[in-house]
Swiss-Prot record:
Comp. bias intervals (Low complexity): 499-511, 543-558
Organism annotation: Mus musculus (Mouse)
Domain of life: Eukaryota
Cited InterPro entries: RANK_CRD_2, TNFR/NGFR_Cys_rich_reg, TNFR_11, TNFR_11A, TNFRSF11A, TNFRSF11A_N
Biological role stated in the UniProt entry: Receptor for TNFSF11/RANKL/TRANCE/OPGL; essential for RANKL-mediated osteoclastogenesis. Its interaction with EEIG1 promotes osteoclastogenesis via facilitating the transcription of NFATC1 and activation of PLCG2. Involved in the regulation of interactions between T-cells and dendritic cells.
Keyword Membrane recorded: yes
Statement: the UniProt record of this protein carries the keyword Transport: no
Protein name per its UniProtKB record: Tumor necrosis factor receptor superfamily member 11A
Localization per record: Cell membrane; Membrane raft
GO biological process: adaptive immune response; cellular response to zinc ion starvation; circadian temperature homeostasis; lymph node development; mammary gland alveolus development; multinuclear osteoclast differentiation; ossification; positive regulation of bone resorption
Length: 625
């Protein structure tokens, strides 16, 4: 390094003097700068100053003065250094063209106009146009730019847009958990999430909704049934029991009527079958009886008539003169026949008979309960004399010769109940067989209805006077038919004689008279009123004429009778089935051909120790002496 320093030479003196002269020249060049283009302009060989922003150049510079500048007026502006002789005007923002002043401007800055919201500036037409609207599921991209069209973007997961808009962006789904609710439906890009309250149940499925109407109808039906059952129970408790009882009675009556119709047809068939029986069966001990008193002859020839005249089974019983009056065995029970009660009185017509009165000889199965006549005192009870009510041990006082019988045949008129006393021995032409043309089978008109006398009727020995036949007329009825007297006239005559209105036919009765429309007793002893099936009266010759009298009194004594009004003949009530009162007619026990004694008095019913003249009183299915 030292050798190099030694090689440096000093400047010569002339150079140093030149440098001293040049230094002041350098200082002068730096004090006077040159003319620039931005703020100066060159005029007359010199640089002049320009006007600043907001002013304009009023006059240029001179060699002795600089440029003169003035400020801009209202709505004018100049935003740069200028040498302009005037200012610029601001723009006008027209609202009709959807323009709005964004910056009003000043002297140094211009005014700026922009399109209103929903419009954008189109440089092609220098005007504002409407922005594009985004469809549901799309949203406008933010931030929105002025004077620019809307940019639509699809909504992301968790966001949705459900409207058409050029400014709305996609909105997020509602968070149901933050609201304290349950999510009912999940959201989409076009719809939000549906939230429900925690107490609100979810909507039932469609299947449950389909069964809901059926369930409602079933509940309504059950309610109606329950209400109806309650109403019926209350009504049945108050008055429904009587209604139920009436309904059951009606059903029972209907069933009884149907059963009665069937059994009635069966009875008719049974009656037809019995009517076509052979002659051999008739002669085995069963004979039909007429309403006339018929006596069996000693030889028994008149019993069978033409059927058994030649002999046969009746040959063994020719010497028998006594027969018992019994009922024909019913082939079939007539359940439809109504049985009257004790306090029921009806006047309806009697029903057609299905049976017939028969005669069987003693010794057969039908044996009377009393083999010997019974006698009852004035103070004794007569209930023991009724068949079927008392035993035979207590019936010592009764005098029954023949048992009571019952028949289903109904008399046509009261005249057929009349009885009379017949003496003598003759045949019995009234006995017929089932195949005989003279017999009465119950299917046609009886001879008694035609009021024609029965030919060959003979008076025979003692037989029951209350014989209930199948329609053969009595001798009195035959005589009435021959004389041309109507049964009604005869009935009136009989009623008059029974009441004592005709003293010539019937002498006045002695003793006490008591009774009602159903029964009348004439006696000299204690008067008794009875209401029963059968009334048995025994009167002796001495009891009628009074004790201690050996000779008959001058005044004739009437026979004891039992009267019954014609209107109530078929309405006598008792515990037995309804049967006509054959022997209970008023005047039937008197007159009608009965023999009278020499002193004018009628013959008593039965004499103590006398002939066995039986008075059969046909009551409610029984006959008494």
């Amino acid at each position: 390094m030292a050798p190099r320093a030694r090689r440096r030479r000093q400047l010569p003196a002339p150079l140093l003097a030149l440098c001293v002269l040049l230094v002041p020249l350098q200082v002068t060049l730096q004090v006077t700068p040159p003319c620039t283009q931005e703020r100066h302009y060159e005029h007359l060989g010199r640089c002049c100053s320009r006007c600043e922003p907001g002013k304009y150049l009023s006059s240029k510079c001179t060699p002795t003065s600089d440029s003169v500048c003035l400020p801009c007026g209202p709505d004018e502006y100049l935003d740069t250094w200028n040498e302009e002789d005037k200012c610029l005007l601001h723009k006008v923002c027209d609202a009709g063209k959807a323009l709005v002043a964004v910056d009003p401007g000043n002297h140094t800055a211009p005014r700026r106009c922009a399109c209103t919201a929903g419009y954008h500036w189109n440089s092609d037409c220098e005007c504002c146009r409407r922005n594009t609207e985004c469809a549901p599921g799309f949203g406008a991209q933010h931030p929105l730019q002025l004077n620019k069209d809307t940019v639509c973007t699809p909504c992301l997961l968790g966001f949705f847009s459900d409207v058409f808009s050029s400014t709305d962006k996609c909105k997020p789904w509602t968070n149901c958990t933050l609201l304290g609710k349950l999510e009912a439906h999940q959201g989409t890009t076009e719809s939000d999430v549906v939230c429900s309250s925690s107490m609100t149940l979810r909507r039932p499925p469609k299947e449950a909704q389909a069964y809901l109407p059926s369930l409602i109808v079933l509940l309504l039906f059950i309610s109606v049934v329950v209400v109806a059952a309650i109403i019926f129970g209350v009504y049945y408790r108050k008055g429904g029991k009587a209604l139920t009882a009436n309904l059951w009675n009606w059903v029972n009556d209907a069933c009884s009527s149907l059963s009665g119709n069937k059994e009635s047809s069966g009875d008719r068939c049974a009656g037809s079958h019995s009517a076509t029986s052979s002659q051999q069966e008739v002669c085995e001990g069963i004979l039909l009886m007429t309403r006339e008193e018929k006596m069996v002859p000693e030889d028994g020839a008149g019993v069978c008539g033409p059927v058994c005249a030649a002999g046969g089974p009746w040959a063994e019983v020719r010497d028998s003169r006594t027969f018992t009056l019994v009922s024909e065995v019913e082939t079939q029970g007539d359940l439809s026949r109504k049985i009257p009660t004790e306090d029921e009185y009806t006047d309806r017509p009697s029903q057609p008979s299905t049976g017939s009165l028969l005669l069987i000889q003693q010794g057969s199965k039908s044996i009377p309960p009393f083999q010997e006549p019974l006698e009852v005192g004035e103070n004794d009870s007569l209930s023991q004399c009724f068949t079927g009510t008392e035993s035979t041990v207590d019936s010592e006082g009764c005098d029954f010769t023949e048992p009571p019988s019952r028949t289903d045949s109904m008399p046509v008129s009261p005249e057929k109940h009349l009885t009379k006393e017949i003496e003598g021995d003759s045949c019995l032409p009234w006995v017929v067989s089932s195949n005989s043309t003279d017999g009465y089978t119950g299917s046609g008109n009886t001879p008694g209805e035609d009021h024609e006398p029965f030919p060959g009727s003979l008076k025979c020995g003692p037989l029951p006077q209350c014989a209930y036949s199948m329609g053969f007329p009595s001798e009195a009825a035959a005589s009435m038919a021959e004389a041309g007297v109507r049964p009604q006239d005869r009935a009136d005559e009989r009623g008059a004689s029974g009441s004592g209105s005709s003293p010539s036919d019937q002498p006045p009765a002695s003793g006490n008279v008591t009774g009602n429309s159903n029964s009348t007793f004439i006696s000299s002893g204690q008067v008794m009123n009875f209401k029963g099936d059968i009334i048995v009266v025994y009167v002796s010759q001495t009891s009628q004429e009074g004790p201690g009298s050996a000779e008959p009194e001058s005044e004739p004594v009437g026979r004891p009778v039992q009267e019954e009004t014609l209107a109530h003949r078929d309405s006598f009530a008792g515990t037995a089935p309804r049967f006509p009162d054959v022997c209970a007619t008023g005047a039937g026990l008197q007159e009608q051909g009965a023999p009278r004694q020499k002193d004018g008095t009628s013959r008593p019913v039965q004499e103590q120790g006398g002939a066995q003249t039986s008075l059969h009183t046909q009551g409610s299915g029984q006959c008494a002496e």
